[in-house]
Amino acid sequence: MFMRIIISVLLCLSCLTAMTCCGSKIEIYDDVSHYREYMSFDSEGTDSKWNKWGMDESIWPRQISDVSQVSDYKMIYYNPWDAQYLGYLVIDYSDDDYASEIDRLKNYPSTDYIGYYSVQKEETYELLAVNAHQYLGFVYALTDGKNRIVYAEQIFCNYFMDIDYEKYIRTDYLLDGFNAKVDNPYRKQMMNE
């Protein structure tokens, strides 16, 4: 009986170790030709790793019609215990496409965002649309006013990101004041620490 308990405990520990090792690799995707594979557009109602906690990503373009307009792209997935996503897409639009996309984004029902994760009023770029959640993070679009639109997202839970996000995304693509580090003040406030 005692031996069975020890074997059971060892098996449980082995499984936990395997889960931790297998699920903790940061996955980086930068081939824009596979863009839709990493978006939640097609994973609604499914148990896909790309469902992104149900956050609405419709701010991002549903498809990219001209890959040559994309100047930068990166999507990161990390799941040490809970899934986390960090991504950005930078598109330099033609004048007509830019005007059309600006119109689409300005009609998006943006949410309040100021105060979540120390975010302040966006002043680095013009904020075109934002979907903010006090627990899950942000999906948004910014513009420099010169035909360039930056789509970005930081989606996570537990009030912090395990990803060293500043290593993977330009800080000017983050909303002004964004702080989702382990010891961020917003987390302390929400956890009553």
Model-derived segments and spans:
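Extended aliphatic helical segments
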Residues: 9, 32, 59, 64-70, ...
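C-terminal motif of bacterial Sec signal peptides marking the signal peptidase cleavage site
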Residues: 17-21
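N-terminal export/targeting and maturation segments
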Residues: 22-97
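Hydrophobic membrane-insertion alpha-helices, especially the h-region
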Residues: 10-15
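Extracytoplasmic electrostatic interaction patches
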Residues: 101-193
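A beta-rich soluble binding module of mature secreted/lumenal proteins
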Residues: 8, 96-100
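Positively charged n-region of N-terminal signal peptides that target proteins for export
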Residues: 1-9
